[in-house]
Each structure stands twice: as C-alpha cells, then as structure tokens.
Amino acid sequence: MPDAFPPCSILILAGGRGQRMGGRDKGLIDWQGEPLVAHVQRVVRPLSDDLVISCNRNQEAYRAYADQVVGDAEADFPGPLAGVIAGLKVARHEWVVLLACDAPRVDQVLIEDLLRLAKANDSAAMVRQGEYWQPMFSVLPKRVLPVLEQAWAAGERSLQKALLREAVQGLACADDDCRLSNFNSPELLQG
C-alpha cells in the first residue's frame, strides 16, 4: 500500500443469521466458483497485515481467509454493531476498513479513496449514496470504540446510528455503483 495511507486493519463482517439466504452463512456461499468471502479477501489482502473476520459460526472455515477470527460478546446474532465492537477490540492498527462478506465487487480504488478521506480529515469515512449512508463500506479510527460501546450499552443496535454519533466524512458514490452490490438473496447470486 502506498506510504500516503496509514497502516490499517481490515474487518470483514460475516456474523449474520442469513435469514434472506434460508439461514445459510452468506460469506461461505459460492459465487463464481468460490465463497463470497474469498472474493472480498482477495481484494483486501494486499492492503493489510491484519485481516479480521467477525463471525458467529463456522469460525474454522473463516480462518482460511483471516489473520484473526472473532465472535460477538453476546450470543444469538446481536447484529453488525456487535461485530464491529468485537473486531475493533482486536484490530492491530489505528485505522480499520469495515466491509461486509457479501460485497464481492468491492475494489481497492474504493478502499483507497475511503482511506485517503479518513486520513485527510482524521475521522471516520463512509460511502454515501445520495441521502443514504453505507456503513458496511467505511474506514474507522479505532478510537471510536468507546463511543460504539457506549451506544451499545445505551441500547442502540443500529451500526449506522452509532457511527454517526461521531464526525463522519461521506465518500459520494453513484446509486448504481456496482462495487457496492451486496448479495442478500439467492436470486442476486445468479447475476
């Protein structure tokens, strides 16, 4: 990674129930001949020496794609905010790139743009499509961990709302930017 970018950890969230996938673990579902998480891992691997996957099941399968695997502190799939908190606790670098396991079209250019924006403003950076924030495409300073923990303790479960408690820089992306496609149903995997 160019010197202009701070060292970063990568946090891939793969801890969901997969309800729209019939309960299947989305990150391990095949797309174009390999698991979805493998596509994301291949893009981000050159960017970091600390790839963390937050998952609540199939941890052994995910170990093949990560330097560290963590689970949520609470059982029963508490949601992405819990996964981010768990991942930030073990991340080795002060900046953390946050991605979902089911976004195989993400590319290094998008990640580098987020890192550049975060570093320039010394704050979190998140993709924004018009009025809509996309928290699963973010760069976070590790120092937001206490803010997220406080939000969790206060009953907040929305990752986006918790992240927006602090300054966040928006990286504008078009509504139809295919790099942001995530696969939330079996039908979307057919494309």
From Swiss-Prot:
Its EC number is 2.7.7.77. Mg(2+) binds at D102. It catalyses: Mo-molybdopterin + GTP + H(+) = Mo-molybdopterin guanine dinucleotide + diphosphate. It is an enzyme of class 2 (transferase). Keywords: Cytoplasm, GTP-binding, Magnesium, Metal-binding, Molybdenum cofactor biosynthesis, Nucleotide-binding, Transferase. Its main location: cytoplasm. One of its GO terms (cellular component) is cytoplasm. Pfam families: NTP_transf_3. The keyword Transferase applies. PANTHER family: MOLYBDENUM COFACTOR GUANYLYLTRANSFERASE. This is Molybdenum cofactor guanylyltransferase. The gene is mobA.
